[in-house]
Amino acid sequence: MSYGLRDIGGERVELCDECGFDSREPRDLLAAFAATFVALEQLGGHPDAGRRPEAETWSGTEYVEHCVDGADQTVALCNRAAGRPESEPPVSLSDAADGTAALVHQLTDAQWDAPTDAWPFEVSVRLAMIHLLHDLEHHVWDIRRGYAKLALADGIEVATSSR
């Protein structure tokens, strides 16, 4: 798997060859974040949420906790870069969704373009939020893959195809 930032056609973009994320695709960030947080909430309620599919792979619950933490860190970073007041740290996925939506909804054009200070290279607030969206969407993919692995391991084998 490879993901990262690339300068393509005068624009800095985030790409992932595992989940297919491509920040060049036009998206409504508010709607994309909302849909992703809904998916995470649903996946967090799965009967296998507390089980790890493999010893080194997080459970659905652990991924959801990581997503709350990642949203908290990124929103705090972007608030700081945009000169906005700190927000209350989220304690739940719904808090993280609300805080992320508030930031996306309230940023001005100039604030979207403000540079952040978390990377050793230039990353705007916009790109930091795009990175957060990728991280969250990728973890939806990770959780679903983990649940499928658990079901394959638990079920009575009828047929298996491997690639």
Each language-model region and where it sits:
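Charge-rich, low-complexity N-terminal segments
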Residues: L15-P26
